[in-house]
């Protein structure tokens, strides 16, 4: 058996201990394992520590403010103001100025039917209008082709963090990247029941869109990785979903703790942000259609790391080799 280590992975090729003079049939055999410490390697893929379900806390009871109550408060406020002005007539000029200011302010935040305008809705509207004018209308050929279908060369796993949109960081154009974003840019191992959403995305990208590259991109100051290193994972939970999700990165945490246990927490986070990318690359190998693409050399796996503090980007590849096993 020969083993090579690439970016924290041992890619092993198995061959028989003895040769045979009998007729043999060659078939490819691939083995990959993720190192969880500096001194030893595991022959199994990363697995979750706990298989017990996590029950969400009860939904909060929300009591809406009734219009009648709102009206009553308004009437009381007006009555109090009128009473104050009757008692202190010298305040009328000041009150008139204040009322004028309030009227002007309400005029900019309310529509004609009295419903408050949403700044978020306005931002979405103006954003789309800018996109339509500056990009969509100026690229009729591109969007005409995209109307017929998509054939992106990249599938990208990136973090949901609002600061690290891969389309902006890597200047992807529409139709270039099939993107999956989640907390800490994690790829879970193959599990048809538990991670069907991720599995469906990978299956669609590889088998139907025929992407030629899958790229997992980590980033600096990742809150998900900070949580991975901070949560005790002792059976108690302070979140409904986050702790269970970031458990996917536990092999990366174990390796970083073993190799850099005495480092400051911020440094541990940086190491783990990168090692979690390698763990996800290892998990991608548990998907049969990904392995098939690697065997056929129609697919490549890459890891990336974006440091938005320094303005730098690292890229590395997961090298994949084959040997042949013998069946008599």
UniProtKB/Swiss-Prot annotation:
Q: What class of enzyme is it?
A: lyase
- Give an example GO cellular component term for this record: chloroplast stroma
Matching InterPro entries: Beta_CA_cladeB, Carbonic_anhydrase, Carbonic_anhydrase_CS, Carbonic_anhydrase_sf
Record has rRNA processing as a keyword: no
Question: Effect of altering residue 159 to S?
Answer: 100% loss of activity
Spell out the reaction equation it catalyses: hydrogencarbonate + H(+) = CO2 + H2O
Q: Which domain of life is it from?
A: Eukaryota
Q: Where is the transit peptide?
A: 1-70
Q: Name one GO molecular function term.
A: carbonate dehydratase activity
Q: What is the effect of changing residue 168 to N?
A: Small loss of activity
In short, the EC number is 4.2.1.1
Q: Where is the composition biased (Low complexity)?
A: 1-15
Keywords per UniProt: Chloroplast, Lyase, Plastid, Transit peptide, Zinc
> What's the chief localization of this chain?
plastid
Task: Enumerate the Gene3D superfamilies for this protein.
Answer: Carbonic anhydrase
- GO terms, biological process: carbon utilization
* Subcellular compartments: Plastid, Chloroplast stroma
Family of this protein: Belongs to the beta-class carbonic anhydrase family.
Q: What does this protein do?
A: Reversible hydration of carbon dioxide.
Cross-referenced PANTHER family: BETA CARBONIC ANHYDRASE 2, CHLOROPLASTIC (PTHR11002:SF56), CARBONIC ANHYDRASE (PTHR11002)
Quote the protein name from its UniProt record. Answer: Carbonic anhydrase, chloroplastic
User: From which organism does this entry originate?
Assistant: Pisum sativum (Garden pea)
